[in-house]
């Protein structure tokens, strides 16, 4: 077993594992992800027999916390080939990536797990649950106006969201 961080020019080598484990993602999304998102991310892997068997991606994000910009990494694409699971690979990848983020002075990281129980042993906790609401235009309400957002609405929606979040949370 060999744990290492891939060099930028090696990132593409993890795509076949991504496609195997995240088969629900469309080919178009995977192409976008490996063309755009892996330009500036970090990919930790575990290799056996010269092949990538497990991986973890750190995608960089800038966050606003208490009016200050903070750089953080979003943990994504944590995957292990089925026949290599239950060997502690995910734990090793998490430990190494968390150590590296700590050494780099990063105050926190985050992820959106498929199942919260997977990450509880690593002290990750749910800090936010997104509520989903569905409205149909056929059901008019005096309080709610429903219309499809256009590209022109994006700036106004972002400003509204940022104002609301700043007033209600420390972001």
Give the label of every model feature segment:
Residues 90, 97-103, 115, 151-152, ...:
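Long alpha-helical, hydrophobic tracts
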Residues 75-101:
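Conserved acetyl-CoA-binding loop-helix of GNAT-fold acetyltransferases
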Residues 126-171:
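Amide-forming acyltransferase catalytic core, primarily the GNAT-like/NAT-type
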Residues 3-78, 163-171:
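A conserved beta-strand-loop-helix scaffold within acyl/acetyltransferase catalytic domains
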Residues 13, 17, 96, 156-159:
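Alpha-helical elements of Rossmann-like donor-binding domains used by nucleotide-donor carbohydrate transfer enzymes
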Residues 98, 103-109, 145:
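Short active-site oxyanion
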Residues 103-107, 113-131:
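Conserved active-site alpha-helix within GNAT-family acetyltransferase domains
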Residues 61-63, 83, 116:
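Short coil/turn motifs at secondary-structure junctions
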């Amino acid at each position: 077993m060999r744990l290492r961080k891939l060099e930028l020019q090696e990132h593409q080598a993890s795509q076949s594992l991504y496609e195997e484990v995240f088969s629900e993602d469309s080919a178009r999304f995977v192409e976008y992800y490996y063309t755009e998102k892996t330009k500036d991310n970090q990919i930790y892997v575990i290799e056996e027999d010269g092949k990538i068997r497990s991986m973890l991606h750190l995608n960089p994000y800038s966050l606003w916390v208490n009016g200050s910009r903070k750089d953080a990494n979003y943990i994504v694409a944590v995957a292990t080939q089925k026949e290599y699971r239950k060997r502690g690979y995910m734990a090793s990848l998490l430990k190494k990536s968390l150590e590296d983020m700590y050494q780099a002075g990063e105050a926190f990281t985050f992820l959106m797990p498929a199942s919260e129980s997977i990450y509880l042993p690593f002290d990750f906790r749910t800090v936010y649950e997104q509520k989903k609401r569905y409205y149909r235009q056929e059901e008019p309400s005096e309080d709610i106006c429903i219309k499809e957002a256009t590209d022109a609405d994006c700036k106004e929606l972002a400003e509204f969201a940022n104002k609301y979040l700043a007033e209600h949370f420390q972001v």
